[in-house]
Amino acid sequence: MSTSGQPPALKKYMDKQLQINLKANRMIVGTLRGFDQFMNLVVDNTVEVNGNEKNDIGMVVIRGNSVVTVEALEPVVNRIG
């Protein structure tokens, strides 16, 4: 996915481990590798979490309209400029 025209709000999350809550009460944890203007996400090293059950699913593309919340699981630095 191209980096031009990306909303700066998501740039600070690149290469960071995130918890992403999806519609239908689904949750994944993984590393953000890319996104586009529709908030479609490319997530690597992804684990789907369902209660106490964890399922490694590798690299996935998440459709933007499925995303409910995105939470950083590691410190994020706000870069100016």
From Swiss-Prot:
Main subcellular location: nucleus
One BP annotation, GO: mRNA splicing, via spliceosome
SMART domains, sorted: Sm
Protein's recorded name: Probable small nuclear ribonucleoprotein G
Similarity comment text for this entry: Belongs to the snRNP Sm proteins family.
PROSITE patterns, per database record: SM
Alphabetized InterPro entries for the sequence: Lsm7/SmG-like (IPR044641), LSM_dom_sf (IPR010920), Sm (IPR047575), Sm_dom_euk/arc (IPR001163), Sm_G (IPR034098)
Superkingdom of source: Eukaryota
GO terms, molecular function: RNA binding
PANTHER family: SMALL NUCLEAR RIBONUCLEOPROTEIN (PTHR10553), SMALL NUCLEAR RIBONUCLEOPROTEIN G (PTHR10553:SF2)
Compartments (UniProt record): Nucleus
UniProt keyword Magnesium, yes or no: no
A Pfam match: LSM
Keywords from the named record: mRNA processing, mRNA splicing, Nucleus, Ribonucleoprotein, RNA-binding, Spliceosome
Keyword Glycoprotein carried by entry: no
Gene of this entry: C29
Cellular component, GO annotation: catalytic step 2 spliceosome; P granule; precatalytic spliceosome; SMN-Sm protein complex; spliceosomal tri-snRNP complex; U1 snRNP; U12-type spliceosomal complex; U2 snRNP
Its biological purpose: Probable common Sm protein, is found in U1 and U2 snRNPs and may be part of the spliceosome.
Sequence intervals crossing the membrane: none
Residue intervals of the Sm domain: 5-76
